Amino acid sequence: MPLLLSGRKFRHDLEASGCLAINVPLEGGAETRLLRRLKAAGYKTQITSVRGLGDPEAFLLKLHGIRPPHLGHQNVGRNGALGEVQQVIPQVNELLAGEKSVVLWLLEGQVLSRSEILSLCDLCDKEPRLKIVIEMGGARALRWQSMRSFIQ
């Protein structure tokens, strides 16, 4: 990887495909460098892990309920047999409120199933201002490709 990575080709490929699979060097640094370049180009960015994502569309764009762990406590007769449901604010919906495009950088993407990856790609098609970068593992050098070509 060159010392000064301009990020122009990465940004062009991200705008063209909407969803990218990326392999980054294990020593780190490449992802934050690219995120800085994207912020300088006018994108809003958010970095998060895919572990515990569940349904990607509901988690990222819709108000949804979760059931917190009970930790052995009993709440008999108050909330039913399944426990209480807490409403969680969507992760990306507030970022899409403005005019700027949003880049969602997802770590540990190798744990995602093929259907979850396809649903993330479909999210980019539904919302053209949302761009998603998924880290699919480590490599000796920084490389990326379209997510649809990666899963085939």
Swiss-Prot record:
It catalyses: a plastoquinone + NADH + (n+1) H(+)(in) = a plastoquinol + NAD(+) + n H(+)(out); a plastoquinone + NADPH + (n+1) H(+)(in) = a plastoquinol + NADP(+) + n H(+)(out). It comes from the Bacteria. The keyword Methyltransferase does not apply. Signal peptide: none annotated. NDH-1 can be composed of about 15 different subunits; different subcomplexes with different compositions have been identified which probably have different functions. HAMAP family: NDH1_NDH1N. This is NAD(P)H-quinone oxidoreductase subunit N. It comes from Prochlorococcus marinus (strain SARG / CCMP1375 / SS120).
